[in-house]
Amino acid sequence: MFVIIGYIVCFGCIFGVYVLHGGNVQVILKALPFEIVTIMGGALGAFVVNNQPKVLKATMAAIPMALKGSKYTKERYMELMAMLYDILQKARKEGLMAIEKDVEAPHESEIFKKYPTVGSDHHVIEFTTDYLRMMVSGNLNSHEIESLMDNEIETHHQEAHAPVAALARLAGALPAFGIIAAVLGVVNTMGSVGQPPSVLGGMIGSALVGTFLGILLAYGVVEPLGGLVEQKTEDAAKELQCIKSTLLASMQGYNPATAIEFGRKVLFSSVRPTFTELEGHVKGKK
């Protein structure tokens, strides 16, 4: 919703002021189809050359996700920490071997089924169960598991930032393709120097539309979208850091109630539940 509002404000102010100053919108509309094909066609072709298929696929998936509202809400994090509390509480009361079935078949586990929002997210479940499995096996200490977690989160960070970097490169290329479109328009105009000034003026105006569109698409559309994708990737990484802090605290001997406090403290303040809110939510899920 806010993305749409932002684009409306951006385009509305730019074209609104242009019209208020007596600008002729017909000049832009007449040149628009040809300039768009030149600029976007060239930029997208370069975009394909510049990125591996996996990055292209990730970028195409990231854009629709960025346009949606964030799924990383306070309610989601409370559900995540309540789920971690339950699984750690079971391990504390009955022993680590008691959670082996939950870890090996999370989609059949009664604990994970209680929390459908995070339980249906395979990234969360895979990350959580992988390290719970290591805790059950007892082959690694907390420092070794922390190192593994850091490596996995760093890999996740690199993969998630590939679309961000790709969109940044696309935004950087669009003004240059706008200039190319403008130069082609000027070349076309120079071939018509015998035309009346009124005709030549229109042709030059159409050529300059290319430069205008290249800059507008770069800094008004693509670059802001890349920034939004980057913020969404930071939210995803923060969720993994929350799980990491909680599990490591448990391995270091803290009880489940204290362990989820470690996880709560790493969350961004805008979505971090208070101690009382989290405590009430956890008790309500028992």
Predicted regions and their residues:
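Helix-termination/interfacial motifs at the ends of transmembrane alpha-helices
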Residues: 5-8, 12-27, 148, 152-231
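Alpha-helical transmembrane segments of integral membrane proteins
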Residues: 2-9, 34-38
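Large intracellular
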Residues: 19-161, 236-286
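N-terminal start-of-chain detector that recognizes signal peptides
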Residues: 1, 71, 220-221
